[in-house]
Amino acid sequence: MLGSICIVLVETTHPGNIGAAARALVNMGLSDLRLVRPQAFPSPDATARAASGEALLSAARVFSSLDDAIADCGLIVGSTARTRSVSWPVMSPSEMAPVVLDASHQQRAAILFGRESRGLTNRQLDRCQLFVTAPVDMNHASLNLASAVLLLAYELRKSALLRDGSAASDRPTMGKDLLATSGMVEGFVAHFERVLHAAGFLEQPSDKLFRKIRRIFTRRALEEDEVNILRGVLSAIEKRIDGAANNR
């Protein structure tokens, strides 16, 4: 279970926080740390803060884009402390943990943490199906990045231990309703956008409108079969549009 969950730190500015996060993950039995455009990594500061997590830190993978970092993951969870204009499910860490563990039986699950100064951007949160917020004192709502990682990792481990007495790092099982990876979903979303342009629906580009359209399909984790069906529908529409254009 825990071995199928990855922690993704996006655009971390202080390398010491990366090392401290690695230490927190080792303490809680997680082993997959991914970094998206860190400001400084590798770094002596990160190594110094990692302590027992130095091996995990050395194995951390660095990505140039968030989409690449989560391409092999099914459920994507965004950590956030801010209220935004688009409605979506927001869970506490204890509510989030069993949902992530369930999803990790089918595909890898990812939990995203944004830059220390601003958190995840709206576009980065658009990649998520659910969101987690720690119930901290609103007068002192800012958590250190490594503390936030430790808090969520602790809830994951606690939930795994309560579930079956073991937090074993087993690989995902291949269930009959396999979740689509983020890469598959993003491929579908790009296909859908092309069809909307071809149909004339998006003649006037609107990021706000397309973000709302995107949420229709990403507010929950889609299954592979569902994505394949939707791609088939889009391909059929494309053929009809192309045929109509050729007959003009």
Q: What are these model-derived regions, one by one?
A:
Residues 1-248:
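Post-transcriptional modification and biogenesis factors for structured RNAs
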